[in-house]
Amino acid sequence: MEVNVVLSSEEIKRGLKHYRRIAKQDILLAADAEKPDDFRRHAEARRSVYAHLSQLAETRSPQEVVQEALRCYQELPFVTGTSSGEHIEVKGRENALENFFLMVGLEPKVRREVRSQRQALR
């Protein structure tokens, strides 16, 4: 699937660094959350996605980084509609990837197409 990415590798790395910092702050604030363990696990899952994509952005083109993010997104099990305490890590990774897609200006149609290919969790 061909994607058009207008951001440079440096812009992608800067944006991901910002997102990683937010996730780190969330990890540090988790103790004050209503459900501290869930909040921390969600933030850790997001942070790991941002770290993975940042590492890729060091050596790969912006298009390759987006393609990898789309591949990761497609491989996630579909857990939308499950209760809030279930599948925290999957929901955190999904949230991180969707934030990344917004950051790079991915066409919503592309994200929806990939999302429709995801398998439901069994």
Residue positions per predicted region:
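Alpha-helical rod/repeat scaffolding segments in eukaryotic adaptors/tethers
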Residues: 2-5, 29-40, 83-87
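Amphipathic alpha-helical binding modules
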Residues: 76-122
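Short amphipathic alpha-helical heptad-repeat segments
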Residues: 8-27, 43-46, 60-77, 90
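Short, surface-exposed, charged/polar-biased interaction segments
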Residues: 33-37, 48, 71-74, 118-121
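Heptad-repeat amphipathic alpha-helical coiled-coil interaction surface used
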Residues: 13, 20-23, 27-30, 40, ...
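Compositionally biased, intrinsically disordered low-complexity regions enriched
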Residues: 57, 67, 82-84
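Amphipathic alpha-helical coiled-coil segments
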Residues: 48-64, 96-111
